[in-house]
Structure formats: structure tokens, C-alpha cells
Amino acid sequence: THLNYYVRTKLMWNSSLDVDAIVHDYCQKFYGEAADWIEKYIWDLEDAVENTDLHVQWGNKHHIPWEIIFTDSLIDTLQEHLDHAQQRISEPTNQLHVDVLQEYHHYLIAFLSAQQLTSLGKYDQAVNKIDEALVAKSNLSRVRSNLLPYAPSWVVETSDSTLEGLSDICQYLLDRINGTIGNLVAFLPCSWKFKTDPFEDGLIEQWYRLDQDIGWDSVTTTLYWENQGYQNKAGYGYIGYAWYQTKFEVKNDVENCPVSLTFGGVCGQEIWVWINQLLVFHGENESSSKPFDISLPENIQAGTNQITVRIHGHGFYRGAQGGIYRRAFLWIPNN
């Protein structure tokens, strides 16, 4: 953020200045003998954002597909730049500046890892990454309390874009499968069949029926659909109706039990769910950031079952956010 302010302030006084030169000047003044490596860090990250073929909009984490941008290769490269910077430092103030950037880096990578692990249904591992992020956050707070953006309580309570909010979501999901309030039956597959429905043909043609061959695509349910190519040439995500479908297996000992279905995260304003052709849920999505539960009817059967989901995402939400982006699972409540 301080680099952004530095560049913006310089450009406010003289908009013809060269941005590369401003960044170089900033690094020389702020990082001293480590400046060259920090400059490499900045431009490698900037290039990764610039070169993504997905829609990117600064100001909201939902509009930046960080999990696509931060590849393992990029993470390793950025850490190598920081390691080289640490080796070049001798002046205490510059050392502090590099240390702070390293903690920012630790915090960001741990936070992103926790988000990805939560989307994949690996909640125990996500909790560990959240703990790592908390350590980095604590280290930053000891340097200065305002180094990380302040998040008011309403943001924490309604969003997964803060560490505290993500921790609450992860614990909510974990409690449903680890015996706290329920036990896991099965995770639904990561990969589902998928089809956009811009002309609302799906209900008329009954796409929820068993074995409907309508030319489905295949997507993962751990990323927004925009992050998987469903966007226009300008980079804005698909807006309208879309359908998901998959099959799942249920063991004999679960048949006739009070099974619940939890969606870890769905971005869309209205949702329909069919199990074995029966509509079991239709309603407004109260929060695109938070999980929600559905009590399933008795038509869950031992063996193979089919689930179909219809989602309506309308024009209020723009950018890289649409569809199922955290894994769904079946569980049995303790009571």
C-alpha cells in the first residue's frame, strides 16, 4: 500500500513521470542495498497480475483471482527474491523494511493457502495455515498496529476476505464432519458437469432429469466459473443462469438417516437444488461468502444418486465471482 501511495502522489504532481523510474526510486530509498531484489519482487508480482487472462480489478479480493495468479512457481520465485534481499542487507532500518515485506509475504501465502484448502474441503490443513497467518499478523502488529488493513466487525461477520471471517467459516464446516455437531458421510466430487443457460431453457427442457445429455462442460467446484473461462472478451464474468450436475454414492448404512447437505460456498443470488429429479431446495442465497445447509428428504438412496444445482447470478455482482467455489458434502447431524 505504501508503494501505491508513493506512486500515486508522484503522479498527482506530475502525471508524465515514468512509473518504472518511480518504483526504482522508491526501492532505492526504502530498501537500500536490497533494492534490486525487492524491485524484482514487485515487477514479477505485477507482471503475473497483468498477464493473467482472467478479469482483475483492484480493491476487492473477490475480483482478483489470486489462487490462479499465485502459482507454486511464482511463490518460489518471490521467496527467492526475498532471500537474496535478506543476504544483501546491513543497515538496520532497511533490514526492518525487508523483514516487514517478508511477513507480508508469509501472511498472504498462508491466507491464500487457507482459502484454497477450505475450498478443497481440507479443513484441518486450512486451520494450520490460518494459525501461520495469525503468527505473521502478530509479527506485523508488533512493528506497527496498522500495517494490515482494519476490518470492521460487519466485514468480519459477513465476509471471508478477512482472516477472522475465513477462520469462522472453516470452523463451521469442520464442526459438521468431525463429530462436533455431525459426522461426514461423503464429500461430493470436485469436478461437476456444467452448462450456462442464458436463454433459460433448462427448466423447460428439464435439465435436472436423470442422465440428461445436453452437451455439458466440466468444471471444478473449488473455483468461480469465471476463473474457468466463463467470461466475455472484456473480461467480465458470465451473468445469468447456470447449471451444475454430478452423481454421488451413498452406503447402505446411511439410507433412511437424516442426511444434510452443506455447500461450502456458492456465489449467486438464487439457488435451486434437485436430488434424483426431486426439487429439495429453492431460495435466495443469504450470503455469497458463507456456507449453508440443506436437510435432505428421504429420496436419498443407497447406491448412486444425482444432484443438480441451478444458480442465478445477476448483474449486481461483476468480476470473478460466480457459481460453486467450495466443495459440498453430505453429513449426518448428531441429533
PLM region spans:
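Extracellular ligand-binding/catalytic regions of CAZymes and related secreted enzymes
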Residues: N4
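Accessory beta-strand-rich segments of carbohydrate-active enzymes
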Residues: I239, Y244-N335
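Short intrinsically disordered coil segments
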Residues: V23, C27, W207-L210, T262-G264, ...
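Short acidic/histidine-rich active-site segments
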Residues: T1
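Catalytic domains of carbohydrate-active enzymes that cleave complex glycans
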Residues: V7-P189
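Outer-membrane beta-barrel proteins
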Residues: A234-Y236
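Accessory carbohydrate-binding/adhesion or oligomerization-edge regions at the termini
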Residues: E164-N232, T246-E249, T304-N335
